[in-house]
């Protein structure tokens, strides 16, 4: 249990209910979920809340296009969103919708309090009106030429080319994005929130530590420009909540959207009577509230939202944490390149734990954009999770099960355990401050130490000697205890792996239990916990993303797909590229002695571009082999693996040393090489027949 239990409410921005979740969205939900899981792991009371943002003109128009009622469409999208999040192991405590009774009541309550307190003004404005559709046009439904830089085809609120903001009436040659008609000006009465009245309060709050420094600096620019009255009104037809005492007038979506955080929590409180809504949202609340958002919506969350809360008698959030955008392979996500990847498309091909880890490994507390480099993604997951983390257990657990009754030994030398536990507070601080990348580097550095310990001790050699049985038991038990500590550290990031490891150890992994004495503890037989990322699956995901676009655009599916992962040169017809060799007789083949070998150690060779130096255990002896697989594997990917070698190949003297055999690999070369990996039941020294 945590020393001092905190009460925490944490939210992610509400996804808009007019389309699917994609990998750009997933960055935020993974970031927030890791933080929420960490808080719970430390024993704090933490509630992770979200909802669909379900109002606005875009939803109304899309529902019309689909021939659905808006309520029907948002219900379908909500179901899809929740399934995608669940399959990515995003553990919301409540997921709701802004189109709810709770949100309607709270939005009206906040509006009426603001009106009573004198913060709502009414005035007549002239607005663009679509004469063909008989509707007023929101900013994003007017397009024209930017009045500042003269770039064409820009939205009615800001220019993507120069970043300028303006009103739709300032556009040059405006057109309705709904019908294409030239809009006309029409007068209408709108209600405005008096944002300038909160300038002093907002300047103090934005510099209180509630925002990252970069965001606080950006807000200073907006303060210098002067805060403006905020139009919170939209005219019918509109899908949203009608404003009290104003028939035909609706709340602008950005008024009720952040109130959706409160609405979702109220819904949770109604389901769990022990929870108090006021304990988290009252002005004198001692609980903590944190919002995780993208950098594109900072203005709403750091100016309008805290001002609305303050003006209506509610508390402000402790912090608003913004993150950057996701790029793929160094560029903006692209539908034509297949890098605009939907969450569901990813899930059809790859393990969600892979992306959770990769995002965590690259996330910091800053607002920098994050690049999902698909080649680096595969290499990092294979190296860190498969080659370092899971490999630590896979190469030692079998000995405990088969030779030591499945029970761990009392560890005599606890030096490594103490070193691992000494990193506990540092890793905790990294999680708390959202420096996940630093936490992952710290954890993987420990994994390197643990794997080096196992490689140096070589328990697979010890078990062959009668007088080394206890030493082997010690080494394997020590390694598994270190593995347990590592996975506990990673539990917020890899919840599914943590569950598998909990089943393996037959106990729950807890932060407070990190230092537990595991002597005599019985483990379950080890089962494979994570597979390598194969580039063909990554390529298939990218190809499917293109195919989805082609279907949407009604492009023939027979179009030849572009190459996906740039480093991949794998032919779909290997026999054409590399025909079968001439026939040999059996006697010639029988001369080749193929043996199972375990890669005990792998290291780079100085001044060699293609070679790795391998130390191979073939049962009764150790061989040194230089293998031309550097372009496909990192040394840490290989250590502990079983492979196949030619054991009776004449030694070859090389500039770097003597090579005493050859390991077998398949593939055309470059990064497209795969060493042969026998079934785990094979043992070093066994002959391949």
Curated annotation (Swiss-Prot):
How the cofactor is bound: the record states: Binds 1 zinc ion per subunit.
**Residues reported in the UniProt entry to bind Zn(2+):** 146, 149, 159, 162
Q: Where is this motif: 'KMSKS' region?
A: 332-336
Could you confirm whether the keyword Ligase appears in this record?
Answer: yes
Q: Name one GO cellular component term.
A: cytosol
Instruction: Look up the EC number in the record and give it.
Output: 6.1.1.10
Q: What class of enzyme is it?
A: ligase
> Which residues does ATP bind?
335
Question: What cofactor does its activity depend on?
Answer: Zn(2+)
User: What GO biological process terms does the UniProt entry carry, in alphabetical order?
Assistant: methionyl-tRNA aminoacylation
Q: Which UniProt keywords apply?
A: Aminoacyl-tRNA synthetase, ATP-binding, Cytoplasm, Ligase, Metal-binding, Nucleotide-binding, Protein biosynthesis, RNA-binding, tRNA-binding, Zinc
Give the residue interval(s) assigned to the motif 'HIGH' region: 15-25
Which residue numbers delimit the tRNA-binding domain?
588-689
What's one Pfam family the UniProt record gives for this protein?
A: tRNA_bind
| Keyword check for Amino-acid biosynthesis | no
> Where located?
Cytoplasm
Q: Which reaction does it catalyse?
A: tRNA(Met) + L-methionine + ATP = L-methionyl-tRNA(Met) + AMP + diphosphate
Main localization is cytoplasm
Note the superkingdom of the native organism. Answer: Bacteria
Q: Which GO terms describe its molecular function?
A: ATP binding; metal ion binding; methionine-tRNA ligase activity; tRNA binding
Function per UniProt = Is required not only for elongation of protein synthesis but also for the initiation of all mRNA translation through initiator tRNA(fMet) aminoacylation.
User: Subunit structure, briefly?
Assistant: Homodimer.
Family to which this protein belongs: Belongs to the class-I aminoacyl-tRNA synthetase family. MetG type 1 subfamily.
Q: Which PANTHER family match?
A: METHIONINE--TRNA LIGASE, METHIONINE--TRNA LIGASE, CYTOPLASMIC
Protein name (record): Methionine--tRNA ligase
Write the gene name.
metG
């Amino acid at each position: 249990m945590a020393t001092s239990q905190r009460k925490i409410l944490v939210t992610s921005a509400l996804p808009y209910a007019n389309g699917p979740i994609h990998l750009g969205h997933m960055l935020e939900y993974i970031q927030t979920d890791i933080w929420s899981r960490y808080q719970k792991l430390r024993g704090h009371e933490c509630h992770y809340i979200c909802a669909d943002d379900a109002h606005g003109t875009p939803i109304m128009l899309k529902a019309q296009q689909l021939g659905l009622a808006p309520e029907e469409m948002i219900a379908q999208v909500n179901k899809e969103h929740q399934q995608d999040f669940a399959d990515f192991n995003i553990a919301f405590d409540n997921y709701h919708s802004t189109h709810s009774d709770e949100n309607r009541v709270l939005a009206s309550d906040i509006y009426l309090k603001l009106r009573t307190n004198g913060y709502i003004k009414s005035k007549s404005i002239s607005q663009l009106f679509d004469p063909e559709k008989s509707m007023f046009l929101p900013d994003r439904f007017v397009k024209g030429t930017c009045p500042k830089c003269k770039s064409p085809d820009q939205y009615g609120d800001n220019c993507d080319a120069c970043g300028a903001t303006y009103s739709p009436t300032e556009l040059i040659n405006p057109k309705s994005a709904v019908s294409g008609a030239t809009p006309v000006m029409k007068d209408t009465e709108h209600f405005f929130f008096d944002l300038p009245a909160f300038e002093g309060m907002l300047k103090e709050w934005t510099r209180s530590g509630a925002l990252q420094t970069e965001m606080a600096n950006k807000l200073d620019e907006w303060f210098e420009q002067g805060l403006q009255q905020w139009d919170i009104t939209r005219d019918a037809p509109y899908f949203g909540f009608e404003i009290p005492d104003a028939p035909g007038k609706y709340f602008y979506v950005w008024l009720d959207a952040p109130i959706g955080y409160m609405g979702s929590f109220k819904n949770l409180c109604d389901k769990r009577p022990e929870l108090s809504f006021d304990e988290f949202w009252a002005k004198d609340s001692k609980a903590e509230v944190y919002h995780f958002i993208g950098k594109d919506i900072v203005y709403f969350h750091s100016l309008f939202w805290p001002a609305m809360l303050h003006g209506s008698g509610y508390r402000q959030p402790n912090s608003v944490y913004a993150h950057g955008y996701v790029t793929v392979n160094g560029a903006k996500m692209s539908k034509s390149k297949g890098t605009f990847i939907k969450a569901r498309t990813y899930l059809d091909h790859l393990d969600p734990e892979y992306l959770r880890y990769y995002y965590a490994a690259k996330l910091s507390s800053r607002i920098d954009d994050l690049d999902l480099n698909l080649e680096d993604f595969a290499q990092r997951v294979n190296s860190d999770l498969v080659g370092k983390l899971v490999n630590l257990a896979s190469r030692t657990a079998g000995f405990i099960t088969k030779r030591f009754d499945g029970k761990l030994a009392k560890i005599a030398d606890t030096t490594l355990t103490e070193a691992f536990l000494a990193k506990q507070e540092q890793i905790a601080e990294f999680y708390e401050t959202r420096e996940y990348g630093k936490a992952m580097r710290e954890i993987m550095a420990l994994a390197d130490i643990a794997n080096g310990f196992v490689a140096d001790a070589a328990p697979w050699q010890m078990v062959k000697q009668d007088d080394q049985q206890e030493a082997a038991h010690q080494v394997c038990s020590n390694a598994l205890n270190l593995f347990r500590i590592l996975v506990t550290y990673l539990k917020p990031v890899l919840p599914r792996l943590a569950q598998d490891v909990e089943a393996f150890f037959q106990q729950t992994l807890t932060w407070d239990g990190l230092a537990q004495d595991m002597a005599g503890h019985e483990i379950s037989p080890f089962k494979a916990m994570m597979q390598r990322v194969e580039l063909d699956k990554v390529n298939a995901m990218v190809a499917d993303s293109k195919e989805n676009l082609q279907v949407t655009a009604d492009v023939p599916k027979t179009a030849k797909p572009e190459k996906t992962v740039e480093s991949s040169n794998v032919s779909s017809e290997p026999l054409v590229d590399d025909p079968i060799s001439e026939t040999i007789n059996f006697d010639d083949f029988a001369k080749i002695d193929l043996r199972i070998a375990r890669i005990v150690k792998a290291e780079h060779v100085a001044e060699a571009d293609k070679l790795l130096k391998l130390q191979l255990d073939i049962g009764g002896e150790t061989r040194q082999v230089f293998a031309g697989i550097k372009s496909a594997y990192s040394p840490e990917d290989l250590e502990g693996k079983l492979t196949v070698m030619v054991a009776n190949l004449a030694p070859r003297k090389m500039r770097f040393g003597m090579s005493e055999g050859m390991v077998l690999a398949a593939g055309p070369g470059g990064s497209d090489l795969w060493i042969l990996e026998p079934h785990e039941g094979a043992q070093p020294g066994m002959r391949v027949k």
